[in-house]
Amino acid sequence: MTTSTAAKRTKSGCWTCRLRRKKCNEGGPPCDNCEARGIHCHGYGPRPQWKDRGALEREEARKLQYQSGRGRSYSRSSSTAAAAAPKPAEGAMVTGGSSSSSRGSGSSIYVGGNGLGGAQEEQHGDNNAPFSAGTGNFEYQANPAPGMSPLMSDINLALDAHAMDPLDFNIDFSSTPSSAVDKSSSTSADSPSFTSIECSQFPIFSPELPVDTPVALFPQVAPIPPGLPGRESVPVAACTDLVISHGLLLAEMDRPVGQRHGQVMAEGEKGIELMMRCPPAPRAPRLEGQGRSAHILLFVRDWYAASSWRIWSGNIQDCQNHIDAAASLLLEHETALVGEAHRLSNMERKALAFFTVRLIWNDVLLSSTRRTVPKAEMVYRRLLLADSNSRGGDSHTTTSTTGPTTTTPLLAASTFWDLTGCEGAVLLAMLDASILSAWRLGEEASGSLSIRALVGRADKIEAVVEGEIARLSSLLPRSPEKTSSASGKPSHGRKTGPENEVTVATVHSLIFAHAILTDLHQTVSGPRASVPEIGDSISRAISSAWNLWQEQQQQGAGLGLERILAWPYCVAASLAKGDQREVFREIIARTENGDGSSSGGDVQQLKSIVEQCWATSSSNHRDWKDVVQRSNQFGVFLI
């Protein structure tokens, strides 16, 4: 390309987003569309130098996180990329040709039709017809409305190639055989190229997302044969997942306010609204093999993403509804998932473990705080019991009256310990304590509460918890000069360091176990700090667990106070008195003055909850669970 050609402007509009279709003068103002989004805009003027380099152009487009679908249709590939791309093996997972990225690993998701080869190429022109890709009964149009994120133009999700922030998603949907349309072939240096694939089977998802980002963990979804119910919902659920995760990431990372907050809220709400319109996951007999388990896994992941969004937005009732929907899928398809667990790929198994464990964690803690019984209690019990047995925990005799529990190989050993830092055996005891609290609430409402039955059931759970405390305490390495104190000063003589890999999770589990004891005494006696059993359990928790946690914080080990340890902190701190309160004030102060890894908003919420409980007299103590429900601060406990 000659210099004169490079300097000549060949197209109109903003060089960054290409949405404004008008003649532009050199040195003109930035594009209103880019300015509204806070994106650095190249503005109007002569053709920038970087437009002449294909690789740098694509890099710039990814950095700007925007690509318009208006005025031209984006292709899945250029003709050169299609010719150079090798044909993948039948049924193989494939990835996109978009290579370099300013953010590391990207994601490529493809839905191929039966026997549809070749490339759908870019068409240039002045027409304003949006590009649409039909997928079953659903249609998506990339025609973003001014002033709104291109993902959220209307209820039909706009599939822009680089609109995701902060992750890059190259989304490409080919038409199904019934709606396939041949595209003419052309190439352009003005738009990114995508590697063309020829899929001779069924829809395939092959994401490559940063595994260290929780909401980015996304399962590989195996092919689902055509003609079966729910096939159309797979791409819909996938796109919805990306939108919800997008909004959640923005919410967690940016903590937006004002207009930005409204845009983030609108994005998450639209994604959830679209997900609610998806056909339900098919029943187990209708799908066979790996496709069924992967399909169910995708929906469980979507419901978890939706519940996480509701946690952030503060709508706890809808959060509980989304959790119940995911739990219902596990409950309905548990047999199928267990029977086909060995067929899942390694990534699918990791995704199944990740989302199932987080779902159980959130549901159990939410049920404990709201004094309710989880909808999928028996599934949770089997999974937690299996995890407990895999780590050599005590045999649990629970208070459930719905039947005996059995183990299941659905999750790998030590999954709860690895993903939450708390053992499944301890979480199982918390589930039993939550069920007991809900039972007492129901009995009191009906006027038939039996104190003898209440104490008897509490004693059974307490015996199990005491056994777990003894087992966990035996795992902590101690030196001969062991010391302990309930006054708040960390005890010394314990070996904590890199050579002791189990100490961190063991201390976390021990903190939870002591908190469960305190919660049990509160269920039986009420939220009264003057009850001897409550005071003794808090003193034990400080001397044998919380002091160890403070030692770990001094050494830079362990997790912060927020989220993971928020529940046991509220249980113990809200009922503390005298010198015990100084210990928990010191814990809050240490977290606030830590290394900056803690979320200041979460810590302040914990502090507010506890201070409200301390503001009342000891004879008429305030229940921290009532404070949380009244202030709608459930999000501080959930992950």
Curated annotation (Swiss-Prot):
Location of this chain's protein in the cell: Nucleus
Keyword DNA-binding found: yes
A single Gene Ontology CC term: nucleus
Keyword flag DNA-binding: yes
Region (Disordered): 58-136, 476-499
UniProt biased composition (Low complexity): 68-108
UniProt main location, coarse: nucleus
Organism superkingdom: Eukaryota
SUPFAM superfamilies, A to Z: Zn2/Cys6 DNA-binding domain
Entry keyword set: DNA-binding, Metal-binding, Nucleus, Transcription, Transcription regulation, Virulence, Zinc
GO terms assigned for molecular function: DNA binding; DNA-binding transcription factor activity, RNA polymerase II-specific; zinc ion binding
Database matches in InterPro entries: Fun_TF, Zn2-C6_fun-type_DNA-bd_sf, Zn2Cys6_DnaBD
Signal peptide feature range: none
CDD domains for the chain: GAL4
DNA-binding region listed in the record: 14-41
Function as written in the Swiss-Prot or TrEMBL entry: Transcription factor; part of the gene cluster that mediates the biosynthesis of the phomopsins, a group of hexapeptide mycotoxins which infects lupins and causes lupinosis disease in livestock. May play a role in the regulation of the production of phomopsins.
Protein name: Transcription factor phomR'
Species: Diaporthe leptostromiformis
